[in-house]
Regions:
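PAPS-dependent sulfotransferase catalytic core
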Residues: 1-50, 158-171
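Residue-level marker of intrinsically disordered, low-complexity segments enriched
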Residues: 123, 157-158
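Detector for methionine-enriched segments
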Residues: 1-2, 73, 87, 156
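PAPS-dependent sulfotransferase catalytic domain
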Residues: 49-151
Length: 174
């Protein structure tokens, strides 16, 4: 998503500390201070007008009253767990996977609910699978969401790479 928004013309807030690797060959687009959002929000003014990658577990620590636009990625949790296992080189025991799955789902639902009820926040939910299988539809939604900025449709279209959709729960190809 970060690559897509950047290609569209939005400026990312990133420090490039975490470099591309085999799990994410196009980069991570992370900003280290985000990891401490629960304890330190002093960096938030630097994010004004930029796109910032924030994992769902940390969204609850965005200050109340902060005007923002949030693109919330929805991805099949089994695909997330499979992707993490591949990246880490180990599978979780089934009981741990179930607990993690329930925790992740709870965080995602709580974050969505909080963002939807926040009058100063605009929210767009994008399904990961749809982005890779129907990119044109999702790109149009993103362009409409970020209006009045003029996102570059062609550049966004070019960066969608279905070959990076390696962990999927069904045998379908994107």
């Amino acid at each position: 998503m970060m690559q897509l928004l950047t290609a569209g013309g939005l400026e990312p807030l990133t420090d490039q500390v975490r470099t591309p690797d085999g799990s994410n060959p196009k980069g991570y687009f992370e900003y280290e201070p985000v990891k401490s959002l629960a304890q330190d929000q002093s960096w938030l003014p630097l994010a004004r007008g930029k796109v910032v990658k924030v994992i769902v577990q940390l969204l609850q620590f965005l200050p109340t009253g902060l005007p923002c636009q949030v693109v919330l990625m929805q991805r099949d949790i089994d695909e997330v767990l499979e992707s993490q296992a591949t990246m880490l080189g180990k599978q979780l025991p089934a009981s741990q996977a179930q607990t993690l799955k329930a925790t992740f789902q709870r965080h995602w639902e709580q974050s969505r609910s909080r963002l939807e009820s926040s009058p100063e926040c605009s929210l767009l939910v994008v399904e990961h699978r749809n982005l890779l299988t129907r990119p044109e539809t999702e790109i149009t939604r993103l362009i409409e969401f970020f209006t009045p900025q003029q996102l570059k449709r062609e550049e966004m279209r070019r960066v969608v790479d279905p070959t990076l959709y390696r962990s999927r729960t069904s045998g379908e190809s994107p």
